[in-house]
């Protein structure tokens, strides 16, 4: 047990950003935070890091809460159940962050930077031209306080940046790696408070962890290079720093970072596909971790009972769908027929979804048994399709892949998943590509329903939901052969240059 845990009750946290679908990586890190806290008789809390107001949505926040609870993870304190350290949304704590940013300014540990975006762009361009890594050059770091106050009083926009040493190394202690040395010259003078008065992750993270009495920060290894900034902020404030533990990142089978292009990454996708929450949690618990007896199938309680964070391996754990499906099958076969029946009914019994499916198939059926043929694809994981399924009178396979890929990006960016927004997006895409909507839609029927003889596809996309729709579209692109990196980059630019289809109406 560390010195910190000997002095204070263990408290861990997960702090997701509500900017998209709930990621399996969030559940993975949440699981290890909860297991560590419970194993030490402590508490696990959840807070929402929604300082990026342009991307954060209430819908995404609710999806995160629902997904984590579905998978079997719960928290002692959070935005929905409150607690002694409320509020638990960063957007509701902006005055707190301003107070601490001002404290750093007054102590001389931070400074106002009045650079315009154009100045920063020019600075980076010059550095790149000289073969340097782009970084803030500290041009306002030593501006006299009186002059800084005067410029601020005159209304000149500014951000607050932290001061960082330019020489030597920062020594960071990590539970899995021991001492890690990072040269200060690699650490940027981080923006702490933006021009709109909202904090960046780095200030909010440190302030919240201190005020919420977090003793151990267990997070992904992508944050290891930010640890010097956080350690420096704790020093500046004179606070005790939590113990750090940087977990290995989940990987695709090719060892690249887990990405939705190669694997479905949303918790809700696995829920809708029919993975048991116990099985998904079990699988995530095996990611880079082994039980003392090398047991493969175990419950959350069993994991907590014998939990030892030092058993985490630093090799990037591979998130393999085939292994997840095998493990889920083991959990399913361990059920009694009665239990399995109830699991199936629970999985399929979404009243709103069933009503929407009934409305879609009603004009097409003559017998109740016809519902199986017309409605089966709504419940499938992925439709059974081949490249030949997409044969088209006028569109080539390359064109179809490009259409489906751009549609995926555009649909993924929708602020709200509605049939109207789906229609506007696909109608706008057909106009932008100068393809008749009727001709363009045939590949969508195949990708979503596995057949052109189906219920209206835009309605189907709405009913099966964003997660499943996007997964099926990505799957269709891969079935057609996939798009190379160079072509994909070019296609991204094409998509970015297209107008906002929702605003074009």
UniProtKB/Swiss-Prot annotation:
A Pfam entry, by short name: Anticodon_2
Any one GO cellular component localisation term in the record? cytosol
Domain of life the protein comes from? Bacteria
The reply on keyword Ion transport is: no
What positions carry the motif 'HIGH' region? 16-26
What is the official name of this protein in its record? Glutamate--tRNA ligase
Q: Where in the cell is it found?
A: Cytoplasm
Report the family membership.
Belongs to the class-I aminoacyl-tRNA synthetase family. Glutamate--tRNA ligase type 1 subfamily.
In which residues does the motif 'KMSKS' region occur? 257-261
Could you mention a single GO BP entry for this protein?
glutamyl-tRNA aminoacylation
Q: Which PROSITE patterns match?
A: AA_TRNA_LIGASE_I
CDD domains for this protein: GluRS_core
Q: Which GO terms describe its molecular function?
A: ATP binding; glutamate-tRNA ligase activity; tRNA binding; zinc ion binding
Which cysteine pairs make disulfide bonds?
A: none
Reported EC number(s) for this entry are 6.1.1.17
Residues bound to ATP = 260
Name the job this protein performs: Catalyzes the attachment of glutamate to tRNA(Glu) in a two-step reaction: glutamate is first activated by ATP to form Glu-AMP and then transferred to the acceptor end of tRNA(Glu).
Q: How does it assemble?
A: Monomer.
Write out the catalysed reaction: tRNA(Glu) + L-glutamate + ATP = L-glutamyl-tRNA(Glu) + AMP + diphosphate
- The top EC class, named as a word, is ligase
Q: Which PANTHER family match?
A: GLUTAMATE--TRNA LIGASE, GLUTAMATE--TRNA LIGASE, MITOCHONDRIAL-RELATED
Query: Which keywords has UniProt assigned to this entry?
Result: Aminoacyl-tRNA synthetase, ATP-binding, Cytoplasm, Ligase, Nucleotide-binding, Protein biosynthesis
């Amino acid at each position: 047990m560390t010195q910190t845990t000997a002095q204070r009750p263990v408290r861990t946290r997960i702090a997701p950003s509500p900017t998209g679908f709930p990621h399996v990586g969030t559940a993975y890190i949440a699981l290890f935070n909860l297991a560590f806290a419970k194993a030490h008789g402590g508490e696990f809390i959840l807070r929402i890091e929604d300082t990026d107001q342009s991307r954060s949505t209430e819908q995404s926040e609710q999806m995160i809460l629902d997904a984590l609870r579905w998978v079997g993870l719960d928290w002692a304190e959070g935005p929905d159940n409150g607690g002694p350290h409320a509020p638990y949304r960063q957007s509701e704590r902006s005055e707190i962050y301003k107070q601490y940013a001002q404290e750093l300014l007054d102590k001389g540990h931070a400074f106002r930077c009045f650079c315009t975006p154009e100045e920063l762009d020019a600075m980076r361009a010059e550095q790149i031209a000289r073969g340097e890594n782009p970084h803030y050059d500290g041009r306002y770091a030593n501006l006299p306080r009186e002059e800084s106050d005067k410029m601020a009083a005159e209304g000149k926009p500014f951000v607050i940046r932290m001061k960082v040493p330019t020489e030597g190394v920062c020594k960071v202690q990590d539970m899995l790696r021991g001492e890690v040395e990072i040269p200060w010259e690699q650490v940027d003078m981080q923006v702490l408070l933006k021009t709109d008065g909202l904090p960046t992750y780095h200030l909010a993270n440190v302030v919240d962890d201190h005020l919420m009495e977090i003793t151990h920060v267990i997070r992904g290894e992508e944050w290891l290079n930010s640890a010097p900034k956080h350690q420096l902020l704790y020093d500046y404030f004179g606070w005790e720093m939590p113990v750090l533990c940087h977990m290995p990142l989940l990987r695709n089978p090719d060892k690249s970072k887990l990405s939705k292009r190669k694997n479905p990454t949303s918790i809700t996708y696995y829920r809708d596909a029919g993975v048991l929450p116990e099985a998904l949690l079990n699988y995530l618990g095996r990611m880079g971790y082994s039980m003392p007896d090398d047991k493969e199938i175990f419950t959350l309680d069993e994991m907590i009972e014998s939990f030892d964070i030092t058993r985490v391996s630093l090799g990037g754990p591979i998130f393999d769908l085939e292994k997840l499906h095998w493990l889920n099958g083991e959990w399913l076969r361990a059920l009694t027929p009665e239990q399995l029946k109830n699991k199936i009914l629970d999985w399929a019994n979404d009243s709103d979804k069933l009503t929407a499916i009934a409305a879609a198939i009603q004009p097409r059926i003559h017998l109740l048994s016809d519902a199986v043929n017309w409605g089966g694809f709504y419940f499938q994981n992925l439709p059974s399709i081949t490249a030949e399924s997409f044969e088209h009178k006028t569109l080539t396979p390359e064109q179809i892949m490009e259409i489906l890929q751009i549609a995926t990006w555009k649909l993924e960016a929708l602020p709200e998943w509605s049939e109207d927004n789906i229609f506007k997006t696909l109608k706008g895409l057909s106009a932008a590509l100068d393809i008749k909507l009727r001709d363009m839609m045939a590949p969508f029927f195949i990708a979503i329903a596995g057949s052109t003889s189906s219920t209206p596809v835009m309605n189907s996309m709405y009913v099966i939901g964003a997660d499943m729709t996007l997964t099926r579209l990505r799957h269709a692109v891969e079935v057609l052969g996939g798009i190379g990196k160079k072509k994909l980059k070019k296609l991204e630019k094409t998509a970015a240059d297209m107008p906002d289809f929702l605003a074009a109406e």
